[in-house]
């Protein structure tokens, strides 16, 4: 209701219902983004809908439970991306490629270690949050987490595409990835159920990452080094291998989790020190 009131106020002040000048500028930018968002919806939801249709409610319920736990990584990615984008646009405009890649390396390292930590913790988290009949979803969670990690990596390219205002190609890359997802679900779900849907999710998000990086490279001026991707993917691949090898060895897994935790603290030590100094300084002034 408040928004509707604002709309009428703005329209009254504008004194013009339609401005062809702004429509010509906005529509070519906005319409492809609608297709991009719809493709993202298909990519994120089609596996559960198709799994329910092909394998029944029980299989879909277990997979949805696994996906919900894995989506914690999506929340982390969304929060960090909101902080990254303004800084990235500002430094891209200033042509600060070196500074961008230096920070991107730290960003990817921290997110990769965080991804590995979430992967390794999933068996215990799953047992705390879900009933015993859902515990079989553990390996599915790791697969979906790996897929969401590629969704994180794809944002480096898509952020540049938005910066270049070439939204037509954004839609093309996302539509292709959504088509890959639907096709793989049709192929894998009847044979492998929830695990098939998880594999389809991983491959589809990888395809999304590849498509958008090809597009960003073709636009020219894309300033993220490809070596940083290999750096991050290698770390998460090791984490994915470790969770599959140590799934039934919780003590060993938690030793690795603690080591990762110390690693995160070590790489963030300067930030932690600065925050502690600010807190202590603030405490003294009070």
Regions found by a protein language model. Name each.
Residues 2-6, 77-80, 101-151, 182-191:
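Alpha-helical transmembrane segments of multi-pass membrane transport and lipid-handling proteins
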Residues 70-105, 158-163:
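Helix-loop junctions and terminal segments of transmembrane helices
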Residues 14, 145-176, 216-218:
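Membrane-interface junctions at transmembrane-helix termini in multi-pass inner-membrane proteins
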Residues 3-44, 83, 87-98, 220-232, ...:
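Interhelical loop/hinge segments that connect adjacent transmembrane helices in multipass membrane
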Residues 25-29, 33, 51-71, 135-139:
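Interfacial/gating helices of multi-pass transporter permease domains
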Residues 1-2, 168, 175-210, 244-258:
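Membrane-interface helix-loop junctions in multi-pass transport and translocation proteins
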Residues 48-49, 59-77, 105-106, 147, ...:
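Alpha-helical transmembrane segments of polytopic membrane transporters and translocases
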Residues 243-286:
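Membrane-proximal transmembrane or re-entrant/amphipathic helices at the cytosolic face
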């Amino acid at each position: 209701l408040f928004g509707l009131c604002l709309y009428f106020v703005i329209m009254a002040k504008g004194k013009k219902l339609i401005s062809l000048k702004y429509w010509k500028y906005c529509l070519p930018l906005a319409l492809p983004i609608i297709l991009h968002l719809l493709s993202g919806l298909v990519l994120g939801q089609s596996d559960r809908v198709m799994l329910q249709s092909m394998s029944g409610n029980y299989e879909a319920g277990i997979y949805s439970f696994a996906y919900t736990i894995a989506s914690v990584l999506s929340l982390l990615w969304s929060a960090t991306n909101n902080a990254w984008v303004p800084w990235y646009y500002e430094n891209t405009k200033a042509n600060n490629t070196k500074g961008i890649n230096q920070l991107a390396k730290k960003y990817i390292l921290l997110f990769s270690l965080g991804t590995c930590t979430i992967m390794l913790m999933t068996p215990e988290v799953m047992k705390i949050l879900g009933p015993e009949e859902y515990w079989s979803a553990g390996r599915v969670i790791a697969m979906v987490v790996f897929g969401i990690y590629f969704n994180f990596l794809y944002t480096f390219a898509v952020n540049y595409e938005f910066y270049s205002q070439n939204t037509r190609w954004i839609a093309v890359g996302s539509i292709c990835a959504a088509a890959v997802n639907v096709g793989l679900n049709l192929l894998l779900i009847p044979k492998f159920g929830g695990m098939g849907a998880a594999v389809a999710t991983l491959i589809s998000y990888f395809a999304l990452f590849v498509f958008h990086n090809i597009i960003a490279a073709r636009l020219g001026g894309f300033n993220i080094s490809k070596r940083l991707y290999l750096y991050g993917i290698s770390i998460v691949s090791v984490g994915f291998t470790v969770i599959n090898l140590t799934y039934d060895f919780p003590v060993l897994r938690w030793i690795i989790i603690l080591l990762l935790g110390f690693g995160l603290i070590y790489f963030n030590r300067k930030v932690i020190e600065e925050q502690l100094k600010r807190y202590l300084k603030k405490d003294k002034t009070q």
